[in-house]
Amino acid sequence: RDNTYSPLALYFILDNNLIESRVEINELFNILIEETNLKKEINNLMIYKKALYNADLATESELLEILNPLISSKSVWKSHALYLLAEYFYSKNEKEKSKEFFNEIINIKNANQDIIKKTKKRLNRDFSD
C-alpha cells in the first residue's frame, strides 16, 4: 500500500496481463482508491483508470457509480470522466445522453483543453442540426 509503488505495480500488472480476473483487478483498484494514501488528484486518476478499465463491459449504472466521485467534483479529471461517459453512451447509440455529457464538458472551468477540442469537434460533426 505504498503510494508510489502500488500504482506502478498495478500498471505493470495491467500492461503485462499478469492477472486475467476482472474481479481481482477491480479489487486492486479498490485497495488503491480506498486504502492507499494517495494525493487527491492521483486518487482521482485511479478512479478514472478504473472506469477506463471497466468501460467496455460495464453497465451504465456500474460506470456511473465508478465515475460519480469525479463527475460530482471539481477534479481536473472531471472533463475526462464526462468525455468517457459521452463516448460510452454514443457507442450504445444513446445520442441524447451522449450529447448531454458532451455539453456539460463545455461548461467546466478547468476542463482539459484537448478534451474541449475533441468535444466541440464531436458536437459539430455528430450533433449539429
Give, region by region, the residue ranges found by the protein language model.
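Soluble extracytoplasmic domains of inner/organellar membrane proteins
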Residues: 17-18, 28-129
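Extracytoplasmic/periplasmic/luminal assembly and interaction segments
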Residues: 1-37
